[in-house]
């Protein structure tokens, strides 16, 4: 661990070649490890813990008052809390863990749905602390974690709002279109 108090690993996919779903997960974790955590580590900012492949010192556990992370995405909750506390999570590309990924679309959908619910929980519980840490303490890591967490939430909420708005517009314009249709039919019948 080179003296680091918290270290995350390279998360690899055990069943990468099973099908397109497992390969997709493998590519997702390559992106997360090599294109997010490696540059974060290079810049000496905090990385994100993902899954079970991480370690932390007893000092960290004592400082946070024991393991108090029980949301659906406890790894992200742990990351957000440490970032708010100004703790750095390092990345070790040589520490490789192998995860078995879902092989069916339904399994993947269930897991992704759980992750989205977990993101919402983390934003609700830790989002304010991340914003405060970013603005008051000037922590880039807090901004980084917000940008990795909030977009999923924002996109979900925005798509919900757009769907409701389009439904309302559809209901209003459909009535107008029906009035135009019946007026045209009536005028055609009279003439």
Please report, for each region that a protein language model flagged, where it lies by residue.
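Short, hydrophobic alpha-helical packing/hinge segments within bilobed ligand-binding/sensory domains
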Residues: 78-79, 108
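Catalytic donor-sugar/metal-binding loop of nucleotide-sugar-dependent glycosyltransferases
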Residues: 70, 79-98
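Long helical/loop segments within the catalytic core of UDP-sugar-dependent glycosyltransferases
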Residues: 2-72, 113, 120, 124
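Basic/Trp-rich segment in TM-proximal cytosolic loops or flexible interdomain/linker regions
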Residues: 43-44, 103-191
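Generic beta-strand/beta-sheet core signal
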Residues: 9-10, 92, 100, 148
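Catalytic cores of eukaryotic secretory-pathway lumenal/extracellular enzymes that build
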Residues: 51, 91-92, 98-110
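Structural detector for helix-capping/boundary residues
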Residues: 58-59, 76, 95
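Short Asp/Glu-rich motifs
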Residues: 18, 43, 80, 101-102
């Amino acid at each position: 661990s080179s003296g680091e108090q918290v270290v995350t690993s390279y998360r690899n996919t055990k069943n990468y070649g099973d099908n397109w779903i497992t390969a997709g997960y493998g590519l997702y974790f390559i992106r997360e490890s090599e294109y997010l955590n490696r540059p974060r580590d290079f810049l000496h900012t905090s990385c994100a813990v993902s899954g079970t492949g991480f370690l932390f010192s007893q000092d960290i556990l004592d400082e946070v008052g024991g393991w108090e992370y029980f949301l659906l995405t406890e790894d992200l909750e742990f990351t957000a809390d440490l970032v708010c506390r100004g703790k750095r999570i390092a990345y070790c590309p040589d520490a490789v863990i192998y995860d078995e990924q879902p092989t069916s679309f339904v399994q993947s959908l269930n897991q992704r749905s759980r992750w989205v619910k977990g993101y919402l929980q983390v934003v609700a519980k830790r989002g304010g602390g991340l914003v405060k840490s970013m603005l008051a303490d000037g922590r880039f890591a807090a901004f980084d974690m917000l940008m990795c967490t909030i977009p999923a939430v924002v996109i979900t909420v925005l798509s919900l709002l757009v769907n409701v708005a389009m439904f309302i517009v559809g209901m209003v314009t459909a009535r107008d279109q029906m009035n135009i249709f019946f007026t045209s039919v009536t005028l055609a019948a009279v003439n």
